[in-house]
Regions:
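N-terminal small-domain helix-loop-helix segment of the aminotransferase-like
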Residues: 2-105, 112, 301-307, 410
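Helix C-cap/helix->beta junction micro-motif
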Residues: 31, 140, 207-208, 369
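Conserved core of the PLP fold type I
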Residues: 61-62, 66-205, 219-238, 242
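PLP-dependent enzyme catalytic core of the Aspartate aminotransferase-like
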Residues: 94, 124, 360, 364-373, ...
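Active-site PLP attachment segment
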Residues: 233-277
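Structural signature of PLP-dependent enzymes
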Residues: 273-290, 294, 301-326
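Conserved glycine-rich beta-strand-loop-beta hairpin in the small C-terminal domain of fold type I
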Residues: 295, 299, 314-325, 337-352, ...
Length: 410
């Protein structure tokens, strides 16, 4: 018999979001008349922008003609026109088109990057953070076994991101030659790294031989012009950082699947070889390129009309976040000492429930309010006693959920 990959034995029991779905199903089964509203998983709910739909429709129709048909590209990095538009529109020329690698989404890029870097790399993650950073590292053999305390993995450096440090980590505990995972705007906290924060990060990475994997999937939600949307706004970042981006949340492509990562030409491994060359070999071997239909939609999303229409949807979600933040300021939450954190630049509201376990709060909100949330403990040890509320939802549902939450008793 073929042996199971030992790395998978080290995974913690259950991935966060399937566990949430399981508890929701069980509650629904025992309460069949309950109308459950989800403020949990970050899946978009609003329709694609009309301009994007028309572009994808036109492309699909062209595929039905001899003149318009095309198969996969010779280069798995994406259509040249889309790579150039990303470089021009998103990065204002800070990076070049050959440094853009179009993909089927940031999550997929994360998995391929983790495979490329392999088991012999040190890992540092924000705590709390998107679970894929840790779970993917475990699968790649870079995390070791679960710590004896049951909190985290032995070979991962957890960088606490708490209200006390403005949700940006102290880098002093990070070992040299580490992969440093940073997400801004952050999932789950919603915090955005400042220019000073990222300058410190870049300086640390360059000094200590680290590579930053910078997840900027929510950058389109930033409304404060003083906050950086890309790590490449910081001098020296091209020598130490890979940035991952996505059309999923800003353009509603969670089901369409389209994203990209930037691998600068200046970024090198210890032996002086270019990371971009290894990444090119990686994707040409293990990936055949993003869907041509999705790429047609991506081109439309980044022209003037597409940007205007997607901004309207982003604003809609940000307004939902404001409604959730308002609901968490009601008397019952104040009496319980609940503190919501949200700067208005992300589709999430992160709330502290002092003295309570986050899964207990999750269960209380589900049972009393019939609202699904996300327990902070699922994002890492420092997420305990926090709850993440997602603003991805229809307005009427968000408003109704807010009303129900005002009756929560803890």
């Amino acid at each position: 018999m073929i042996r199971r990959n030992n790395n998978f034995k080290n995974l913690a029991k259950g991935y966060l979001f399937p566990e949430i779905a399981k508890r929701r199903r069980e509650f629904q089964a025992s309460h069949p008349d309950a109308h459950i509203i989800s403020l949990g998983i970050g899946n978009t709910t609003e329709p694609l922008a009309p301009h994007i739909v028309e572009a994808m429709k036109s492309y699909v129709e062209a595929l039905g003609t001899p003149e318009g048909y095309e198969g996969y590209q010779d280069d798995s990095a994406g259509k040249p026109a889309l790579r150039q538009r990303i470089a021009d529109v998103v990065y204002s020329g800070r990076i070049t088109a050959d440094e853009v690698f179009v993909s089927d989404g940031a999550k997929c890029d994360l998995g391929r990057l983790q495979f490329m870097f392999g088991a012999g790399v040190r890992v540092a993650v924000q705590d709390p953070s998107y679970p894929v950073y840790v779970d993917g590292s475990v699968m790649a053999g870079a995390a070791g076994r679960e710590a004896a305390t049951g909190k985290g993995f032995a070979d991962i450096t957890y960088m606490p991101c708490l209200p006390e440090n403005g949700f940006f980590p102290d880098l002093s505990a990070v070992k040299s030659d580490s992969l440093i995972y940073i997400c801004s705007p952050n999932n789950p906290t919603g915090a955005v790294a400042t220019r000073d924060n990222l300058s410190q990060l870049v300086s640390f990475a360059r000094t200590n031989g680290c590579i930053v994997l910078f997840d900027a999937a929510y950058s389109a939600f930033i409304r404060d012009d003083s906050l950086p949307k890309s790590i490449y706004e910081i001098e020296g970042a091209k020598e130490c950082a890979i940035e991952m981006q996505s059309f999923s949340k800003p353009a509603g492509f969670t089901g369409v699947r389209l994203g990209w990562c930037v691998v600068p030409q200046q970024l090198v491994f210890e032996d002086g070889s270019k990371v971009a060359d290894t990444w090119t070999r990686m994707i040409n071997t293990a990936f055949n390129g993003a869907s041509n239909v999705a790429q047609a939609g991506g081109l439309a999303a980044l022209d003037d009309v597409g940007q205007r229409q997607t901004k309207e949807t982003i604003d809609y979600y940000l307004e939902n976040a404001a409604l959730i933040r308002e609901a968490l300021g009601s008397a019952n939450f104040k009496a319980a000492g609940v503190i919501p954190y949200s700067g208005g630049n992300a589709p999430y509201v992160w709330a502290a429930f002092p003295g309570h376990k986050s899964w207990d709060v999750f269960d209380a909100i589900l049972s009393q309010c019939h609202v699904v949330t996300t327990p902070g403990a699922g994002f890492g040890p420092s997420g305990e006693s926090f709850i993440r509320f997602s603003a991805f939802g229809q307005r009427e549902s968000v408003q109704e959920a807010g009303g129900r939450l005002s009756h929560l008793e803890l």
